[in-house]
Amino acid sequence: MPRPFPRFEMPLLALALTGMALSTTACSRTDESPAADAGARSTQDWSALKDFTEIDATGPDNVAVTIGSGFAVKADGDARAVADLDIRVKNGKLVIGRKSKGDWNWGRKDGDKGATVHVTMPAITAAALTGAGDFDLDKAQGERLDLSLTGAGDFRIGTVALKTLSVDITGAGSVKIAGAADAAKLSITGAGDIDAEALKVGTADLSILGAGDIDIASDGKVAISIMGPGDVTVKGKAQCTTSGVGPGEARCAP
């Protein structure tokens, strides 16, 4: 009688199943990796937030403000960034930040690509930006607008019609603004820039401590103080008085 062949069916089956299991595990790990989620985007709504006239934004995220009827707050962007947002109203101020704080990425977590917070509000009187985000405001009018910038972010302001405007920059950020104001106080500490060439003011108090630059337009009295290599340019028929120390230059010309 012929000798039967060895029975390898079960070991081969076991090896096949083991290979399938390893393959499935590898696929599962690939799907759950950070790289697979890096492109995920999401949107979140904070419809209950209202009754604020100021905004305080801290972190790496961008803010886009539209002046309109009623209040609306929503965010979109990297899903990880949106999930990490902390937005609330405190003492008439919309406070925007991150749940995770204190790292060198100004709050960014696990390399997320950031979010944009979209805000609609009837009027705005003040905005503070700390970090590396950008702040866009379509327009503003009324008694005053106070802008404070700390870090490397940017303010981009559309057309304003104000009685008083205050801008304070600490760091390397920039502010671009147009329109008109009866009086303006603009201050830079560091290497920031204020592009207000399209802003016509009645009177102005301009101050630079560092290497920043200010451009503005005025036909009124303008007081200029420069400590360092910063420059001030005033277009129009302004009556300028200057003071300071350093190589910085003040130019007042039509």
Where are these regions (language model features)?
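Conserved acidic catalytic centers in enzymes
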Residues: 59, 151, 228
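Short, surface-exposed interaction patches in beta-rich subdomains
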Residues: 159, 174-254
